[in-house]
């Protein structure tokens, strides 16, 4: 009798549990509650593992990592978790700037903080710095420990150029020195001799440190590809490589002389260059907008300024230098030639893209009218204008850089285990790339910055610079 009563009790408890579960389900409650620090609810997730959107999702963050993603029917945040209501917005990975410049240590603390925040304000959560300085190691540690607000940093070395490296022995010495210092890659610049470049490449392979950046004119594109340069930035030396061997000038023409080559380039060589790039596995970081604004421009500073209101977040003396650089360049070059060079660069980029080359997004900020973070949106818009799909552009701004760094398990997607480096935007970027700029907020390593907080900080910066 007692056993029967216990059995009846267990059955009744089971029925009550089922009834409660049925009521919770009928009322729309989630099946599982997840503990964490912060949870996004009512968001549409762009995972960036492929071109699809996960609608009405809950994303839970703990200790700076994504720990759970699921539909609102399946999971929800436990009581006490801070909730960010996405209000049907779109949650995507943070952007990666693959050719950025970090604040000069000679700048004031305010200017340093401002430059770093400009990246974050625009959803740029990782930056590959391409002009090294010893002060950047401290900056990186301050960011890692939350003492300074800024993106995750990968540090390029002090410039390997002709002034610092004149012979092969110096190249070998610098490579070993920068590896020990802790730089993530070697920044290659102009002026290296063929011998010094080969010594750099051989020593870099020996000590296991990648190198990238410019292609020294004396070396040339094909040699750089052959010896394993990891990235070629600015499409450096691609136009020169389109000149047939029989017409190669006796000495390098340099950046300012590229226009002279337009009469002798042979675009039929482009497919061979694309194939060589793909076979080498080299990454290309084109920095298109800067080059068309500063070097192969057909517009003066007044017109550029009218399209770049974000210059109000830069020191006025910096903007004045930019104005002078653009106008001086326009006065000393032929606009038609600039237009032809820019068009050929666009053709090279699209040939590389369509041929399957590795491409990553970079802007060379802060340089001439390329304001950190904001310049990323201009660069992405241009790529779509040239014929890439929004998804393809987002790939090269998020997941593909993580592949470059061999860090696909760490960042570049919205997935469990990834860093909580996220950008919340109000419209679907797959439909219009300009929606990436319509931020509702940014999460940086698990720390949330609402659009209001970002806008207030930007307003303070503008006032600080007298705008």
Segments predicted by a language model, with ranges:
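Histidine-rich, glycine-flanked metal-binding segment
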Residues: 31-36, 45, 50-92
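Metal-associated gating/positioning segment near the N- to mid-region
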Residues: 89-147, 163-169, 195, 222-228, ...
């Amino acid at each position: 009798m007692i056993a029967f009563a216990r059995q009846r009790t267990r059955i009744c408890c089971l029925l009550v549990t089922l009834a409660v579960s049925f009521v919770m389900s009928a009322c729309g409650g989630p099946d599982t509650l997840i503990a964490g620090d912060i949870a996004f609810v009512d968001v549409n997730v762009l995972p960036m593992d492929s071109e699809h959107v996960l609608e009405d999702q809950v994303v839970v963050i703990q200790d700076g990592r994504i720990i759970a993603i699921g539909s609102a029917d399946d999971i929800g945040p436990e009581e006490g978790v801070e909730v960010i209501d996405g209000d049907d917005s779109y949650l995507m990975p943070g952007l990666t700037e693959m050719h950025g410049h970090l604040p000069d240590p000679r700048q004031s603390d305010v200017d340093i903080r401002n430059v770093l925040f400009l990246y974050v304000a625009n959803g740029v959560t990782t930056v590959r710095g391409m002009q090294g300085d010893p002060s950047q190691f401290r900056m990186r540690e301050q960011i890692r420990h939350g003492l300074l607000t800024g993106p995750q940093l990968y540090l390029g070395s002090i410039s390997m150029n002709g002034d610092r490296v004149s012979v092969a022995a110096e190249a070998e010495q610098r490579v070993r020195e920068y590896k020990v210092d802790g730089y993530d890659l070697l920044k290659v610049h102009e002026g290296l001799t063929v011998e010094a470049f080969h010594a750099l490449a051989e020593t870099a392979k020996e000590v296991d440190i990648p190198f990238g950046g410019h292609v020294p004119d004396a070396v040339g594109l094909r040699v750089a590809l052959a010896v394993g340069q990891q990235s070629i930035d600015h499409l450096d030396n691609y136009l020169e490589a389109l000149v047939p061997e029989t017409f190669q000038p006796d000495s390098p023409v340099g950046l300012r002389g590229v226009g002279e080559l337009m009469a002798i380039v042979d675009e039929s060589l482009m497919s061979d260059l694309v194939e060589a790039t793909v076979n080498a596995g080299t990454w290309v970081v084109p920095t298109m907008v800067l080059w068309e604004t500063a070097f192969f421009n057909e517009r003066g500073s007044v017109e550029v300024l009218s399209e770049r209101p974000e210059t109000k977040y830069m020191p006025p003396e910096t903007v004045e230098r930019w104005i002078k650089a653009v106008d001086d360049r326009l006065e000393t070059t032929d606009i038609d030639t600039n237009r032809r060079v820019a068009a050929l660069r666009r053709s090279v980029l699209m040939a590389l893209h369509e041929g399957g080359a590795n491409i990553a997004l970079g802007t060379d900020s802060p340089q001439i009218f390329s304001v950190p973070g904001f310049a990323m949106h201009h660069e992405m818009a241009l790529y779509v204008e040239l014929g890439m799909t929004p998804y393809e552009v987002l790939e090269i701004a998020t997941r593909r850089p993580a592949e470059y760094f061999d860090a696909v398990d760490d960042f570049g997607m919205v997935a469990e285990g990834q860093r909580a480096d996220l950008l919340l935007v109000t419209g679907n970027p797959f439909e219009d790339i300009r929606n990436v700029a319509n931020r509702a907020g940014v999460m940086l390593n698990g720390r949330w910055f609402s659009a209001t907080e970002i806008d207030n900080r930007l307003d303070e910066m503008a006032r600080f610079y007298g705008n």
